């Protein structure tokens, strides 16, 4: 005998039967099964889902003489996707997570997107892993580079008076004031504190 099982994440319909022994009712994993009649030995039955759900596994099975099925029951799931992951320091735009819908990822200021920006929901799964938002490393400014050189010259000198003299000469040469030095040091301090908190 041959059966058709129609599923809508909950409902399954059984058609036709014979009189010899019975197999356990076919189950759609994660769903409930309602059968109109028992499944008998040598009966073949097929699973079929409505358009808004899909199943993974074989779409048919048969009841054997030892009252087991030829194949395992399929797993049924919605074609729609769950909410996507939100990357740290980022967000996505799109509120529809139905099959065929698309979302777009963005990053906060000072971060860049690494990975796929646009993702689509296809048969209950997003097309790729969520992207990440990576901090953009700022290139040092010329004044900061000159300040670094001045600090290195200060550290290399073994005599304090000579070190201070070299340091101030470098500052004057690069047109740096003590106010700019102070500001640069405060920025470095803030960056170090931020790194320590991560």
Swiss-Prot record:
Its main location: secreted. Glycans are attached at residues 42, 59, 66. The keyword Repeat applies. Residues 1-17 form the signal peptide. Keywords: Complement pathway, Disulfide bond, Glycoprotein, Immunity, Innate immunity, Repeat, Secreted, Signal, Sushi. It comes from the Eukaryota. Residues 22-77, 79-135 form the Sushi domain. GO terms for biological process: complement activation, classical pathway; innate immune response. One of its GO terms (cellular component) is extracellular region. Disulfide bonds join 81-121, 107-133. Pfam families: Sushi (PF00084). CDD domains: CCP. The keyword Isomerase does not apply. SMART domains: CCP. Gene3D superfamilies: Complement Module, domain 1. It is found in: Secreted. Disulfide-linked complex of alpha and beta chains. Controls the classical pathway of complement activation. It binds as a cofactor to C3b/C4b inactivator (C3bINA), which then hydrolyzes the complement fragment C4b. It also accelerates the degradation of the C4bC2a complex (C3 convertase) by dissociating the complement fragment C2a. It also interacts with serum amyloid P component. PANTHER family: COMPLEMENT C2, SUSHI DOMAIN-CONTAINING PROTEIN. This is C4b-binding protein beta chain.
